[in-house]
Design a protein with these regions (language model features):
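Multi-bladed beta-propeller domains
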Residues: 1, 30-55, 81-106, 118-122, ...
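Beta-rich, blade/repeat-based domains predominating
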Residues: 4-5, 57, 152-156
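Beta-strand C-termini and the immediately following turn/loop, strongest in propeller blades
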Residues: 6-8, 14-21, 28-31, 56-73, ...
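Generic, well-ordered alpha-helical scaffold segments in large soluble proteins
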Residues: 7, 16-17, 30-33, 43, ...
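Serine-hydrolase catalytic core recognition
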Residues: 10, 16, 144, 149-302
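Glycine/Thr-rich phosphate-binding loops of Rossmann-like dinucleotide-binding domains
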Residues: 23, 76, 122, 171-172, ...
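Short, small/polar residue-rich loop motifs at catalytic or cofactor-binding pockets
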Residues: 23-24, 52-53, 74-75, 98, ...
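A short loop-to-beta-strand structural motif that recurs across blades of beta-propeller domains
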Residues: 26-28, 77-79, 129-131, 173-175
Length: 302
């Protein structure tokens, strides 16, 4: 039991109840006069409710509406509930992609700014893009475009933002855009000429099919700077397969721990196999009562 919240009029309070086993999560309202309880929202799953990573609760006004995060349709999305009638008003976001994080709620304008992953079908589904949508689910606008993962810095009046995006094989690009995502100009593009002169090489991105022969599995390869295509190298896979997140780097860096080991004469590979987080619910559920799997069938495939 946590997140206890009193209504402004003190006529009721709400709390979250995470049932033992993590298959039921409820928000329950309690009448402060007579102690009667009613469920406001209920999440159930035959496997698990990912309450520790995919949780967002935002009360609108005096609590008459609730913005709630859920995987109930198989993907992590936002929903708007009528808390007085104790029912869903409408999905705020929907589609075969996930909401990663809510960044800002404009209560008067009834809009939400949030981070999305997988919203561009032809890009790596782990890349973060930034979006805006109305609370009634209309007007979805993707504010970022570049084929990479994005970070935003807003102007104080939120009329403009600087979009910094990169990939492991693409040095950072900084763009100036307006609040609706319209491109204004490129501010700066990182110059790595001096870095390349040291012999440093970009990692290589790759995609392979998973154990089912259908699901795309995304990974990165690091080779020694003196790599010789004629030679044969031992391959080491860098593995941390905890189901609470994903681990393959997505943004550009000039230093990777994997590269340090590659310099000893190895090829390093890292993937995020089935059972890791931030894809579909089905993808994540592979870990259910199956932690020992650790994505190994997908690793064997590549």
């Amino acid at each position: 039991i946590n997140r206890i919240r009193w209504a402004k009029n003190s006529r009721e309070f709400t709390f979250e109840y995470n049932e033992r086993g993590h298959q039921v999560l409820r928000i329950i309202s309690v009448n402060s006069r007579n102690g009667k309880t009613k469920p406001v929202v209920e999440e159930t799953s035959n496997t698990f409710v990912d309450y520790s990573q995919k949780h967002y609760e935002y009360w609108v006004g005096d609590g008459e509406e609730l913005i709630w995060m859920s995987e109930r349709n198989g993907w992590n999305h936002l929903y708007l509930f009528d808390t007085r009638k104790k029912k869903l008003k409408n999905p705020i976001t929907q589609g075969n992609w996930v909401v990663r994080k809510v960044e800002h709620v404009d209560k008067s304008g009834r809009q939400i700014w949030f981070q999305a992953m997988g919203i561009y079908p032809k890009q790596d589904p782990y890349y973060i893009h930034h979006c805006r949508v109305n609370l009634d689910g209309t007007g979805l606008t993707v504010l970022t475009e570049g084929n990479g993962t994005h970070e935003l810095q807003w102007s104080p009046d939120r009329r403009f933002f600087v979009d910094k995006w990169s990939r492991v094989d693409q040095p950072p690009v900084h763009e100036l855009r307006s609040v609706d995502g319209k491109f204004i100009c490129e501010l700066e593009r990182a110059d790595c000429v001096q870095l390349y002169k040291t012999g440093w090489k970009l990692p290589e991105r790759f995609v392979s099919k998973g154990r089912d022969g259908e699901t795309d599995i995304f990974g990165v390869i690091w080779r020694p700077t003196n790599f010789d295509r004629v030679k044969r190298y031992p391959v080491i896979e860098s593995i941390y397969a905890g189901p609470h997140s994903f681990y393959v780097p997505k943004a550009f860096r000039d230093y990777y721990g994997q590269q340090r080991m590659a310099e000893l004469g190895f090829i390093l590979v890292q993937i995020d196999g089935m059972g890791t987080n931030w894809r579909s619910k089905k993808f994540h559920d592979v870990c259910w009562q199956n932690i020992k799997d650790a994505g190994f069938p997908d690793r064997i495939q590549w």
